[in-house]
Every structure is written in structure tokens, then in C-alpha cells.
Amino acid sequence: MSDACIYCKTAQRCPSDMIQAGPVALIRKLRWLYAPDPVMAGYALRTTCTSLLALGIALWMELGSPQWAALTVWMVAQGTRGRSLAKAKWHLFGMVVGVISGITLVAAIPQAPLMFILLLAVGIGTFCMIGTFMPGPASMTNYRIHGMRASGFTYAIVSLDGIADPHHIFAISMSRATYILLGIVLEASISGLFQLGLTKRTRHQLASTFEDTLKPALTAIAGILVGKEGAMQNVQAIFAQITTLGDQVEFAEVELGRHDHAGDHARAALADIAVLLARALDLATLMRLPLSQDDMFRQEAEAIRDMFLKLPARLEETESMASILADLLTLRRQCRQKVVSDFSTAQPDDAAREAVLRHGMLQQALVELIDALRMALTQFEASRHPGSHDHFHSPIRSYRDWQQAITNSLRSSVTVFGAGLIWICTAWPSGLTFIMFVCIVCSLFSTLERPALATQAFLRGACCAVVAAGILNLALMGKSTTFEMLGMWSGLAMMIGGLAFAYPPLTLPAVSYNLFLPILIGPSNQAKTDEIVYFNTALPLVLGLLYASWMYRVFLPYDPAHQRWTMREHILRDLHRIADGRAQETVDSVVSRNVDRFVRLMTNSGSTPSPVIQAYLTGILSGMRVMLNLLRLQAIRRDTRLNPEAGQALALIMGRMSHFSGRYHGHYGRTLRATKLAILRLRTCERNEDRPRERFVLIAALTSLDVIATELDTNRIFFDARSPYLDPSLTPAELESTG
């Protein structure tokens, strides 16, 4: 039976349900409007009142474009105090840079339109390039990048307004700076009135952030310890949560002030959870090897599992952190004692000696797992009770990608220059307004990895603003002559935008709506916005966003396959640098960089088939673990207790691994063979070694080498740089082998 027949029979049986399905679904989608979250409804009301106050003061001061004061309030206002202050600080910085740059541009090129457009485009591109280098993720919530965005569009509005009247550029720029500063000061001041008990609430939020991340991580590790299938299925969500919460720690630091280093400790604790997961993945790899598990290991694994599962409840209670750390230290000592007792027991044959070695490697992995958890808990305790003379610092890491920065810069510069050519060639009277909107869009979105999608959502919000402003200007406020009427109707429209901003699926369209609505309303002391002014503003707005969206799709568009290839090349190059000994990498830097790659790939996967994304995610995690074990081997090579023969074997594997240098010269096969040869030589060294300390060092080296060899073998297609990884020509069997 066809789908059409099934639909007809269903409609005949229950026609009322079919009719009501559409309206019910629509009503549920509008729940953000008629049943909003009370906290976010308060945010929308507070920001609306602040915006109207800024607009009223700007009108009272008789500023030339008072709508920018109201617009700035909506640009700076965020759901939390920390976000608002962080964004306000960087917005103010960007405004100062943009004003100075705009004055310089107009003063240098007052009567050369083509050169003016060229330098305007170069300036926007430069700000985008600098923004790409800012620490943190390339997202709309990164307010360091927002500082460069603010520089870009302030540079544009000052220079575009000033080029029409270059003799008064200083007065124009001071006017623009005044209403932007007015909006920032009002929003920061009024939002502070509603933040009672902020410090206590923020410290509680930092604690809950850590606990909410640690609990699923410990649950996954507990599954690994008992050999549960699919125990690490939710590791992707945990890494994404670590990245998101790590970004939010910065705003908690702003709310707490710079009196202590609680935020630094919280950021380090979240990073240690990522290290904990990496150690758990190493343990899972070793547990799959033959002769690795015995009854004693299973008993210890069960004891550690029980400890991990009970840990979240113990953190929520009043139990001291010292007792928890003492229990973990006891478990660690038991693992060490098990290895020492095996050292003192004579083994009857080589098979028994091999089994003892495997057990020792598992015990070493358990020790490293416990150490990672102890480090995370220590940092968590320091974030809850920071010391008075604490100088600990865990910075937000940034990874400069020159290729991405140049791409972002060219994309924005060419788009702005093209808009300028359209204005020069057509002599459009509203051409400067058109260029201004294009500059705003390029400044906001060119630092994102997928600007076309963001611009599309921005266009929808702008269209809603056009409709709302049309109703206000042409119908509701057509005859109003008082600020009270203006405030009543525009405040109602702004309130709707504030409620939409609090609803995640509508956040970006709501930003556009709140940004452009005051511009389209165009309040002024001298005149009202009639239909001519309204359409001459709305048309450049819509056309500017359409043009920018089109340019993002045709000029240097986002290519997910290229991003995956680039990530893979960088991972192979990092392996080369770490093995070569030239990279000044640490465990935290390796984990944070690869977790960032992991989350970026998940975020930007788009319509890519799930098996391809899953295989790349597995490859990134595998590469991260190989890097961590290479760092450990580098440390072991510097240990004076390592005998010369073992040191020579490690030097050989490092030399081979250093050939992972790019796309076409992988030397994968020789590297894998060298790794297995080094394992055999170190096993011989361990078999001939009687001193316990030296045997511990050899077992640690063998643990790392076994993990590296297993990862190289399991993810052959990812690490073999000569292969076209996940090319459409690959067979399903080859694709499955990558996972």
C-alpha cells in the first residue's frame, strides 16, 4: 500500500486529529512567547526598559542617531551578569579602536571613493583576521572576538557617516561614541541592580559545573572497568560539555572579580576531566589485549568502580575532600603493591612472565587513571576554597590558524569591496546604507567557520524586524508625537525580541531583530519616519543581507571535507613535532587542542554521513592518545634509570614517528613496525631487569608503546598519510575498519 493510501485511510478514521495536529504544533512552537521562562522573561523586560531609557536620554541629549543607543543595549545585554560585563568591556574596547580607525580613514582619503572603499574593506578584513587569532572558540559567545567585531562595524559606521561630511568627522565620531558609551553604561549599571547574592550563586554554579561534568565521565569509566560494551558511547557529549562549560568559566570569573583564582582552578579541573577520559580510553585499549586480565585485576577494578560511582554523592555531602583523596591514594598504593608483589614472585616460564608483564601494564594504567582523578579533585577543591596567596593560572588557550585567518579576512574584504563597487557603479542614493549593513554582517560573522548559515538566520530576523518596523512606523505610530507613545509600541516589539532571544532555536534571528529594529524605527526629535525613509532603509537592509549571504556561499565557501583533511594533516604534523622533540607541548595543551578539534568537527558536521564523522572523531581521539603517550615516552627517555638498550629502542620509535609530517609522506608501515620492534626489545629488557624501580620505568614505557601500536593498527587508514582517508572510493569494509 502506498504512503498516500495510508494517509487517506488515517484521515478518514480520525479527521479531527489530522486537522488539529497543525495548530497544536504551532501553539507549542510559540510557547516561548506565551509561557516563557520567568528568569528570561525578567531579562527581556529589564533589557527593554534599559533600551527605552537609553533611547530617551539620547533624544533628550539631541544626538544625531539616537537609535544606536538603544541598539547598543541589546548588543551588550546577556542572560547573566558575567556575560554582560565581559561583552560590555570588549565592546567598549572595540568601539574605541573602531572610532580611531574611522577618523584616520576619512582624514586620509576624503575625496577618493574607490580608495576609500578599498581601505574600508582592508580594515574590515584586518579586524576579522585579528579576531580569528583571539583565544577561545570561534563562536558568537566569544567576547574577545566580539571586541574585533565591534571594531569592525564601528569603523564602518563612523567612516561611512563621515565620508559624506569629512569636515565634521570628529564631531560625527564623538556623537557615535557617545551613544554607544551611553548604551554600555546604562546596561551595565541597571543589570547590576538585579544581581543580589551574585558571588555566592556563582561559586555554587562553578561547583555544580564540575560535578555535572564529572558524574557522566565517572559513569562511563565505571563501565570500562567491568568491560561493559559501549561504555564510552557518550564520550562525545562529555567532551562537548567540557568545552561549553570551560567557556562559561570565564564569565564566572568576571562575576567573582579578580580577588582569587577560583576560575583558573575550575578551568584546570575541567581540563583534568578530559585527561581522565583519555586515560580511561588507554585502559580500555590495554584491557582488550590478550593475557591482560586476571582475578586480582578484576577485584581491583570492581573496587575502583564502586569508588567512582559513589564519588558524586560524596562530593554533594559534607565529607571533606581530604578523606576522598586519601581513599584514592589507598587504591593507588594497592595497585603499586600488586606490581611489587609480582616482582618478588618467581615465574615458572616465559608465558607466566608475559602474563605478569601484562598485569603490571594494567596496574600502571589504573595508577594513571587514579592520578588524573586526584588532580581533577584537587583543582576542584581549590576552586571551592581558593587560597589567599594563590598564584595559580590556567589561561584560555588559543591556536593560531593562519590559513583560517587569511580565509576569513579575504572573505570579508572581498564582500565589502564588492558592495562598494555596486554603490560606485550604480550611484544608488542609499548605497552607503547598503554598504553599512554589509559591513555589519561581515564584521559579525566572518570569524565563524560557517558564516553562510549564520547570515541566513540573521536574514530571517531582519525580515521580521522589517515587518515589525513597518507596522509601527506606518500604522501604530503614524500620528504619535510623544516619547510615551514611542516607548509603548516600540517597547512591546522589543519585548517580543527579548523573549525570542531566550529561546535557543531563535537566538540568532532574535539578535538580528533586536539589532535592526531601532534602526528601522529611526526615532528622531526633528522628524518621524515616513514610508519613504522606511523603505529606503528596509530595502538596503534586506538586499545587504541577501548579498552577504550569497557571497559567503560563492566566495571561499565552507568546505567540511577540506576542514576534515586539514584537521588530519595538523594531527599528523603534531605527532611529528612531539616525536621530534621540538614541540613545547604539555598534557593539558595536547588534550585541549584535540578536544577543540573534536567539538569543532561535531559542530560543523552538517549533512556529512554519520559513519564518516564517526570515523574522524575516532581518529582524533586516537591521535590525542598517541600524542599523550609520546609525551610520556619523551619523559621516560630523560629518566636516568632507563638502561641504554631501552633508550636506543625508544629513540628509534621517536625517529620513525617524526616522519608523520603531512599528507604524502606518512611512512606509516615502517613506523608501526618500529613500534612493535621497540615493544619486543623493551620486553627483553624488562625480562632481564631485577631492580623494582627500573622495572616500573620499563613497564610505563611498554604501556605507552602498546597503546601507540594498538591505535596505529586499529586506525590504519587515519594514520597512513598516503591514503585518501574516507574517500568515496573506499569500500564499506574499509570504512568500518577505521572505527
UniProtKB/Swiss-Prot annotation:
Transmembrane region(s): 53-73, 90-110, 114-134, 178-198, 421-441, 457-477, 491-511, 532-552
Keyword presence, Ubl conjugation: no
Topology within the bilayer: Multi-pass membrane protein
GO cellular component: plasma membrane
Keywords: Cell membrane, Membrane, Transmembrane, Transmembrane helix, Transport
UniProt KW Cell membrane keyword: yes
InterPro entries: PHBA_efflux_AaeB/fusaric-R
Short name of any one Pfam family annotated for the protein: FUSC
Subcellular location: Cell membrane
GO MF term (any one): transmembrane transporter activity
Disulfide-bonded cysteines: none
Family classification: Belongs to the aromatic acid exporter ArAE (TC 2.A.85) family.
Protein name, per record: Uncharacterized transporter GOX0755
Species per Swiss-Prot/TrEMBL record: Gluconobacter oxydans (strain 621H)
